[in-house]
Regions:
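N-terminal accessory/pre-domain segments preceding catalytic cores
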Residues: 19-234, 344-374
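Secondary-structure boundary elements
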Residues: 209-268
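Sec-dependent signal peptide recognition
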Residues: 2-10
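Hydrophobic/aromatic-rich core segments of domains that either
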Residues: 277-342
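Mature secreted bioactive peptide module from preproproteins
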Residues: 168, 172, 200-202, 224, ...
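Periplasmic OmpA-like peptidoglycan-binding domain that tethers envelope proteins to the cell wall
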Residues: 266-276
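C-terminal motif of bacterial Sec signal peptides marking the signal peptidase cleavage site
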Residues: 13-17
């Protein structure tokens, strides 16, 4: 079919009566894209040329004849050159998928025409099935789905693009959903074109662990999270639930303090982890149980350390799950009790515990004095 379409396009040009050497040789693209329509498309100015080129790219069309009978013959070349430059520079799909656009002037049906050829560096499927995100919120959702699937990349057309710190976005999502993001990948980011409110966003993820292994780890970690939900009694108070989840997490193993690239899996399935893994998993387990727990980043005795701040009965407290490595039990601590810990106080709630009741005001003695006694 591709070869037939190419021959039809060449035939349109040859029937004009010009010599064969006056026209571009039309060869089907090896990537499998469509070769186009032999019917010439009439263009009369720059805007129409630009629209025709963008339509070719959007449809993954390789060859198309443009009829330029209504244009000044002396302006055709300059106008088409400008339209090609603009298309490649500003159109998201062209910037993403086009390797080269070439053309040859001639005639079609005894009228001036241009045979345009486009060479692509993406497959027809990649072009025609490009996902779309209306804004950065939808883009973030697509990125999260890709992370959940341990995919190696995600690409989409973003209609309203805003510059974003994607490394931080991925780290935040991984911290909130450690049962899904087993390993935080390194990220390579590209936008097509490089600048603009509407562009194609491509993120490539690199993992040290194979996708098959990551999916297996996901399944095992999610089973542990399911067990944690069952461990919490529905009629318990929030204080009891915090304590139950603390015990569930810290008493699973005789833990060994080490850092792992598959933090949640190593901690929950092999008893190997650091303070960050403890705090992240505890916060996520609390969230699945309807409890509020933040992950705090700071230092403990001068070393990098992570712990949690929980909200219990309307009051905030510090809880350090990794203290179990030193034999610690569940304790709700106020700020003044965090000896050896340092954190950015402006970033987290103040942990003062319940307010002390105000002392009762002294009542004035209204009993009569001895002088007034009768």
């Amino acid at each position: 079919m591709k070869r037939l379409a190419a021959c039809l396009l060449a035939l349109v040009l040859l029937l004009s009566g010009c010599s064969e050497g006056s026209y571009v040789s039309v060869k089907p693209h090896q990537g499998g894209n469509t070769s186009g329509n032999a019917q010439a498309v009439a263009v009369g100015n720059y805007e129409e040329m630009l629209a025709a080129l963008k339509e070719m790219v959007a449809g993954a069309v390789e060859q198309q004849v443009l009829s330029v009978a209504d244009m000044d013959e002396n302006a055709v070349t300059a106008t088409l050159d400008q339209a090609i430059r603009t298309t490649c520079r500003t159109d998201p799909m062209a910037a993403y998928a086009v390797e080269e656009i070439t053309y040859e002037r001639g005639q079609s049906g005894n009228l001036p025409a241009v045979a345009v050829s486009i060479r692509y560096n993406r497959t027809r499927r990649e072009i025609l099935q490009m996902p779309t995100a209306a804004d950065m919120d939808q883009a973030a959702s697509r990125i999260q789905v890709a992370l959940n699937g341990c995919n190696s990349s995600v690409v989409m057309l973003v209609e309203r693009y805003e510059p974003t710190d994607f490394v931080q976005l991925i780290e935040d999502y991984a911290a909130s959903y450690p049962e899904w993001v087993i390993e935080i990948p390194t990220v390579a980011e590209a936008t097509y074109p490089e600048a603009g409110d509407r562009c194609i966003l491509e993120l490539k993820f690199s993992y040290q662990t194979s996708r098959e292994s990551l999916r297996t780890m996901q399944s095992r970690v999610q089973s542990v999270f399911d067990s944690a939900r069952l461990y919490v009694q529905g009629d318990s108070s929030d204080h009891e639930k915090y304590n139950q989840l603390f015990s569930f997490l810290t008493q699973r193993f005789d833990y060994k303090a080490e850092t792992s690239i598959t933090a949640s899996y190593s901690l929950l399935c092999h008893g190997v982890g650091d303070s960050r893994a403890f705090a992240t998993c505890y916060a996520a387990m609390c969230a699945r149980a309807g409890l509020s727990a933040l992950v705090v980043s700071g230092t403990r005795d001068g070393e990098s350390w992570f712990w949690n701040i929980i909200e219990d009965d309307g009051d905030y407290y510090h809880v350090d799950p990794a203290a179990s490595l030193m034999g610690g039990d569940f304790r709700e601590l106020r700020d003044e009790e965090m000896e050896g810990y340092v954190w950015d106080y402006s970033e987290y709630p103040v942990c003062t515990g319940p307010e002390e009741p105000e002392p009762a005001a002294e009542t004035e003695n209204t009993e009569p004095t001895g002088e007034n006694e009768k």
